[in-house]
Amino acid sequence: TKYPIIQKEYYQQKKFVNPYVFFGELSNLLNNKSIIIADDGGHLTWAIQSFKVKKGQKLFSAFGNSPMGYAFPAAIGASVLNKKSKIICIDGDGSIQMNIQELQTVVANKLPIKIIVLNNSGYGIIKQFQELYLNKRYEATTPRSGVTNPNFKKVSEAYGINYNLIENNNKIKKILKKSIQSNKPEFIEVLLKADQKIIPKLQFGNPIEDLSPLLSRSEFRKNMFVKTISRSKKIFEAN
């Protein structure tokens, strides 16, 4: 691949987990009967970009409808109806809290769902938007601006669900493998950098083929089979 989503340098990251590396490893470990359900947020984008769906697997999300809190109850429904499939719920630290009380439903019905929560300490997509277009005015997106998380370890243990913490790339494979093989529900918290970016990303005013970080103009034109569309300065400045 000329422009791989999972860059070599991502594997060298020492602190926190790189989400692209994480979903690459998750993709490798899941069998072809797995059902993966992702919520709305940065974790959905990272999953769609770097998870390679195998034949027989199913990956669901509400996508453009974007309802935070969808994935967990959807995973519960999938688990009830698909006893022989591994059910993987992909959530964020914000979206899991929309229906976190349903951990009791998982316990009461003995559903072996793997609940993966990617924790970037806030609303990452909105924060990235605020950084790009609002001069880094982080309102209602970070702990400092009013968005905080509970102690997920204590929450999962209060419901009697086994808790796992993945805090760097080196721990991804070992913990995921153990959790996936378990026949019980598992809560897996994945710690990301608070400023973890979605890359590549389309910015205002650019045509869909001209993603950020931008290629040099000569390389971009070389890749194009049709005439290029100029970047709209008017649209960019309006936003």
PLM regions and their residue ranges:
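Glycine/aspartate-rich loop-and-adjacent alpha/beta segment that forms the canonical ThDP
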Residues: 177-239
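Thiamine diphosphate
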Residues: 45-124
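Active-site diphosphate/adenylate-binding microenvironment
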Residues: 2-73, 78
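Short beta-alpha connecting loops at secondary-structure transitions
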Residues: 57-61, 98, 127, 133-143, ...
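Conserved thiamine diphosphate
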Residues: 8-9, 131-175
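Glycine-rich beta-alpha junction loops
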Residues: 40-42, 119-122, 191-196
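Generic beta-sheet signal
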Residues: 34-36, 85-87, 113, 184-190
